[in-house]
């Protein structure tokens, strides 16, 4: 029974979230009122199941809950504000209508997800290559445990830099706003499952989707070990750009080791100290260029 749960929870979690969001968006419910309770319900579910069957027992409890929840709320508000800004721009700027709106709604959402996902991957990858971007992105890597809230732990400026390109492109090509909102909600739930402390197994799905088994390698404390698996939803980008990595033998025998930032053992632990940290400190893992 445990093994069945481990292999089925990811597809059940994501498919049910996907179709719940699609159904609510098509039902005429306010797009923001539709996604907030869905994200909250799946967040609560992720919290409960990862505490019931943890991958790493040392990650079950921590002192970072309030900090990470603050990041989640702040960054969600940034997303909503950005979308309202883009809606306002769309009213005043006659963007071309190139997006295939004749497709079924669920296919439109998958297409928008793919567009947004590529730019998330690309900016994330560059954030490990250039020092000025890394200083912002280091906030995400400062956690010393992985659990469902880590997915949205980003510096506010990095949140804007990482999310804007894909969303702006969607706007420019005429993607309907409900499609973008649905795509972002589904992505948020996948990020929960990507960072969760739940001991689940994705099986063949990890060849296609960015699951926890892959993303945990990305959070290893040693800089040289963490330059892998940048994707947020699809693994295809990591495979194309040769940044994909997996080692099941070591994963299941030795684990992934410590996570965090080895070069920064005294990283600030409050929101505002972390907010200002990139602007006045020389953060570890400097640019290689």
Show where each model-derived region lies.
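N-terminal membrane topogenic signal
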Residues: 1-12
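Cytosolic-facing loops and C-terminal tails of multi-pass membrane proteins
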Residues: 239, 250-289
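Aromatic-anchored segments of alpha-helical transmembrane domains
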Residues: 16-21, 189-193
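Hydrophobic alpha-helical transmembrane segments of polytopic
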Residues: 35, 39-42, 113, 183
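Short, hydrophobic transmembrane alpha-helix segments
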Residues: 20-33
